[in-house]
Swiss-Prot record:
A Pfam family reported for this protein in Swiss-Prot or TrEMBL: Ribonuc_L-PSP
The protein, known as: 2-iminobutanoate/2-iminopropanoate deaminase
NCBIfam families: Rid family detoxifying hydrolase
Signal peptide annotation: none
GO molecular function, one term: deaminase activity
Source lineage: Eukaryota, Metazoa, Ecdysozoa, Arthropoda, Chelicerata
Record-listed E.C. numbers: 3.5.99.10
Alphabetical GO biological process terms: 2-oxobutyrate biosynthetic process
Cellular component annotations (GO), alphabetically ordered: cytoplasm; cytosol
The keyword Hydrolase is annotated on this UniProt entry: yes
Highest taxon in the source lineage: Eukaryota
Catalysed reaction, written as an equation: 2-iminobutanoate + H2O = 2-oxobutanoate + NH4(+); 2-iminopropanoate + H2O = pyruvate + NH4(+)
Transmembrane residue ranges: none
Source species: Dermatophagoides farinae (American house dust mite)
SUPFAM superfamilies recorded: YjgF-like
Length: 128
């Protein structure tokens, strides 16, 4: 088994619990969930869900790039949302960060998320 490497960047919010921003094993990187927290203020982005989702994807991108990968290397995205009425807006934001062919994806409705977030995004990256 390949040794694991911990990925950490100051360009994304620091973990709010006992976990790493990402862990790399071999050429696969497993990203922890990112929420719409502004890294400079450590406050949640307020306003439309679109703004919160953009911040969550921006945070995810920072961790992806800290691993040495690109967003086009993302193979799987898991999105957790509190309200499925937000689904179309989150889809629109995702298209700002990914182009076809899109990564595989699951979207799961949940009752609550950390910091009262409305969306949380985790992903798996394979570095070629």
């Amino acid at each position: 088994m390949s040794p694991k490497r911990i990925i950490s960047t100051p360009l994304a919010p620091q973990p709010i619990g006992p976990y790493s921003q990402a862990v790399q094993v071999g050429n696969t990187v497993y990203l922890s969930g990112q929420i719409g927290m502004n890294v400079r203020t450590n406050e949640m982005v307020t306003g439309p869900i679109r703004d919160e989702a953009q911040q969550a994807f921006t945070n995810m991108k920072a961790v992806v790039e800290a691993s040495g990968a690109k967003m086009s290397d993302v193979v799987k995205v898991n999105i957790f949302i509190r309200n499925f009425n937000d689904f179309p807006a989150i889809n629109d934001v995702m298209k700002e960060f990914f182009q076809s062919p899109f990564p595989a994806r699951s979207t799961v409705g949940v009752a609550e998320l950390p910091k009262n977030a409305r969306v949380e995004i985790e992903s798996i990256v394979v570095i070629e």
